[in-house]
């Protein structure tokens, strides 16, 4: 049984936010790098970078906090498609999270995309997670 690196990334960021820990270190894979870039581009995290220790690569993510409140921008995240149960959607049926305030991250034939990008390119794929 393999590790689910997407769930590790999402859970690590969510747990770090709950205990107000600023940075998270997870194993770097192509999928986690792409999801990290999407979260950075959409403004849910402040920074993401790759770090190497010996032969292992890690992804270090820094949480983004609101100014006066000690709350993060990424309030909730939910893993949708799991290794035991894959969930697919065409571009017309991609759900909207909180009326468009959150994002859906999809794995498509053109890479890891947000729901807006997938609708614009008119391609569907596997729904990986919701973030809001």
Swiss-Prot record:
Gene Ontology MF terms: rRNA binding; structural constituent of ribosome
Record keyword Amino-acid biosynthesis present: no
Domain of life: Eukaryota
Function: One of the primary rRNA binding proteins, it binds directly to 16S rRNA central domain where it helps coordinate assembly of the platform of the 30S subunit.
Localization of this protein: Plastid, Chloroplast
GO biological process, one term: translation
GO cellular component: chloroplast; ribonucleoprotein complex; ribosome
Name listed for the protein in its UniProt record: Small ribosomal subunit protein uS8c
Subunit structure: Part of the 30S ribosomal subunit.
InterPro entries: Ribosomal_uS8, Ribosomal_uS8_CS, Ribosomal_uS8_sf
